[in-house]
Amino acid sequence: MANTSSAKKATRKIARRTAVNKSRRTQMRGSVRTVEEAIASGDRDAAVKALANAEPALMRAAQRNIVHKNAASRKVSRLASRIAQLGK
């Protein structure tokens, strides 16, 4: 438990930031899930469109330190390679 007033304020700030980050992380995961569902259904056009929406969401999350930038880039790369395999 925080004892000083500054520690109590820091706890409140952390709670607010956690809520914002949780929302952004959920939004990011939802966009990735849309791409994965399109890939699973075999619909290449839908997957490409979904990836066009998911990539900026992932990069925004990386920019805001919700996920590491390398993790975001790796996720985009793996999704793109899976979409490329749909065409074969």
UniProtKB/Swiss-Prot annotation:
**Disordered as annotated region, ranges:** 1-33
What exactly does this protein do? Binds directly to 16S ribosomal RNA.
One GO cellular component term of this record is: cytosol
Give the gene that encodes this protein.
rpsT
Instruction: Return the NCBIfam families for the record.
Output: S20
| Superkingdom in the source lineage | Bacteria
**Matching PANTHER family, A to Z?**
30S RIBOSOMAL PROTEIN S20 (PTHR33398), SMALL RIBOSOMAL SUBUNIT PROTEIN BS20C (PTHR33398:SF1)
Disulfide pattern = none
GO molecular-function terms, A-Z: small ribosomal subunit rRNA binding; structural constituent of ribosome
Q: Which InterPro entries match?
A: Ribosomal_bS20, Ribosomal_bS20_sf
Which protein is depicted? Small ribosomal subunit protein bS20
Q: Which HAMAP family match?
A: Ribosomal_bS20
Q: What's any GO biological process attached to this entry?
A: translation
Q: Which UniProt keywords apply?
A: Ribonucleoprotein, Ribosomal protein, RNA-binding, rRNA-binding
Q: Does the keyword Ligase apply?
A: no
Entry's family note: Belongs to the bacterial ribosomal protein bS20 family.
